[in-house]
């Protein structure tokens, strides 16, 4: 099996799977090209040492993040005070109970690809009657369908 063009991925059992950090980068870049603002939430990129046991891990609690909070919020200047919360997962990534609870309440969407994220954004644009912008997002998806989405 060939690696998809333009993607840094790892292979497992003959299937290529993008790392979550790569997925987030692709999502951020795609949305930025379409004029959206992306607010990233979550753990720091650096690991910190635990004062009690000495082990290293990604720090989250001290940042004040709610457990289960989405990875990103998407906003657009033409949305007034609205935003879309997206929890990104790899194709094999497990969803935590808190993440699923927020998704079940309609507060976030769990997405496993750029295509899923952009589809959510297009539907949100439709709900706001921003049909021209929704079509712009769909055309972007169509033009880039050969890319690792």
Describe the predicted segments one by one.
Residues 1-149:
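Catalytic phosphate/metal-binding cores of nucleic-acid and nucleotide-processing enzymes, i.e., regions
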């Amino acid at each position: 099996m060939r690696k998809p063009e333009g993607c840094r991925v790892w292979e497992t059992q003959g299937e290529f799977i993008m790392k979550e950090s790569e997925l987030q980068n692709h999502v951020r870049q795609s949305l930025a090209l379409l004029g959206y603002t992306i607010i990233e939430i979550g753990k720091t990129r650096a690991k910190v040492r635990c004062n009690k046991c000495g082990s290293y891990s990604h720090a989250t609690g001290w940042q004040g993040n709610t457990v289960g909070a989405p990875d990103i919020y998407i906003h657009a200047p033409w949305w007034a005070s609205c935003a879309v919360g997206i929890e990104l997962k790899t194709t094999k990534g497990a969803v935590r109970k808190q993440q699923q609870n927020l998704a079940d309440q309609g507060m976030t969407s769990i997405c496993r690809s750029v295509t899923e994220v952009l589809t959510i954004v297009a539907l949100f644009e439709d709900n706001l009657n921003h049909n021209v912008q929704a079509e712009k997002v769909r055309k972007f998806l169509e033009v880039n369908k050969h890319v690792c989405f």
